[in-house]
Amino acid sequence: MTDFRQDFLKFSLAQNVLKFGEFTTKAGRRSPYFFNAGLFNDGLSTLQLAKFYAQSIIESGIRFDMLFGPAYKGIILAAATAMMLAEKGVNVPFAYNRKEAKDHGEGGVLVGAPLKGRVLIIDDVISAGTSVRESIKLIEAEGATPAGVAIALDRMEKGTGELSAVQEVEKQYGLPVAPIASLNDLFILLQNNPEFGQFLEPVRAYRRQYGVE
């Protein structure tokens, strides 16, 4: 059986979502790689991305009753992943939020199925954790329970303290976070594919400086 995490990273490279080189992160760090999930922006790539999410979610073992996608990136992720989960025999409802509340029609900030039971949040990455915190507030305000967070990539790097943004979410809320792939998987990709050999040492150095266990 192939490693879907490695397949996901190779797919991300093919879509130019994952790039190697010299980049500056929002935190001002010089990074040897860059991941931009916004470039999964056509039908086929979104379909394949949703398949990876569905597989990752199922293999995580997280128990959930529905999906929630925080605006804006999470909206399409929740809808597409719900369809792929349904193909795998897991048919669950999904919902998302608006950035601005509507005062007409159905109104409010929530769209889709009512938030009930155990709600799995789905997003592209966890950077500062702001989107997750806002999602948790929305879910709990509706009387539902956050079940965990599914993301595309865990960069596994320190935030302002010693913990990564993912670890901070896990610690603060006691929620499991299920990434399709992580920095460790990226490191394995570089080790096993000589054509990317020139980036192995820069990624190793970056992990040494900013990485978490």
UniProtKB/Swiss-Prot annotation:
Query: Has the keyword Glycosyltransferase been applied to this entry?
Result: yes
The GO cellular component terms are:
cytoplasm
Annotated positions binding 5-phospho-alpha-D-ribose 1-diphosphate: 26, 72-73, 98-99, 102, 104, 123-131
- Molecular function, one GO term: magnesium ion binding
Q: Give the residues the record marks as binding orotate.
A: F34, F35, S127, R155
Look up the EC number in the record and give it.
Answer: 2.4.2.10
The reactions it catalyses are:
orotidine 5'-phosphate + diphosphate = orotate + 5-phospho-alpha-D-ribose 1-diphosphate
Cofactor(s) for this UniProt protein:
Mg(2+)
Any GO BP annotation: pyrimidine ribonucleoside biosynthetic process
Q: Does the keyword NADP apply?
A: no
Pathway assignment: Pyrimidine metabolism; UMP biosynthesis via de novo pathway; UMP from orotate: step 1/2
Q: Which UniProt keywords apply?
A: Glycosyltransferase, Magnesium, Pyrimidine biosynthesis, Transferase
| InterPro entries from the UniProt entry | OPRT, Or_phspho_trans_dom, PRibTrfase_dom, PRTase-like
- NCBIfam families recorded: pyrE
Task performed by this protein: Catalyzes the transfer of a ribosyl phosphate group from 5-phosphoribose 1-diphosphate to orotate, leading to the formation of orotidine monophosphate (OMP).
Q: How does it assemble?
A: Homodimer.
Can you name this protein? Orotate phosphoribosyltransferase
